Amino acid sequence: MSLSERLCRLLAFNERVQNMLDDEIFDITAMPTDEYKKQSCGDASFIFDLHKSLDIMSKDWLCELEATADFAKNNTLSNRFDKPLTAYLDYCVRRYYLSAIDSFNVISTIKRMVCAYIVTAYELERLENPTQAKVVKILQGYSKEVEHSYENGELLEDEFIFNPLFSTDNLIGIL
C-alpha cells in the first residue's frame, strides 16, 4: 500500500477518533481504517500558501517552497519517495502524534503530517533524481523551517481546525 493511501486511512480513522473524543466517547475499539471516500481536489496551493505565511528563517528555503508550489500546480505525486518520507512521518508520529494524547487533538497532528508529506514529496518530485543526501537535507530543512517556532505550530493548528480547506475530505482528495 502506498504512503499516500496510508495517509488517507490515517486521516479518515483519526477524524472518527477525534469526533469520538470531542463527544467524550472513550470506548474507541476496533474501528475499520479503510472507510473513506476519495474525491478529487487536486489543488494543493492552499497548503503551500499556509507554509509561505509561517515564520521561515531561511530565504533560500522560502524560494524553494515557491518553486515547489509552482511545480505542484502541474504535476502529481508518485510513490518513488515513499521510503524516506515514511521514515520522516515516523518521526512525526513520535514527535507530535504521541503527544496529542494530552491535548485530545489527534486530527490536527495527522493533518500536520499530511501537509509535511505534500510539501516535501512535491519538492522531491521537482528535483527528479535527488541524492540520498539531498533527500535528507530536504526533510531536515522542512523540519527546521516549520518546527522551530511555537507560533508556527499554533498557526498550523488553527488553520487545521478552522479553515475548511484543511478538512479531512479535502486533504484526502489531494492525496
Language model feature labels by segment:
Residues 2-175:
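Hydrophobic, aromatic-lined core segments that form the binding pocket/scaffold
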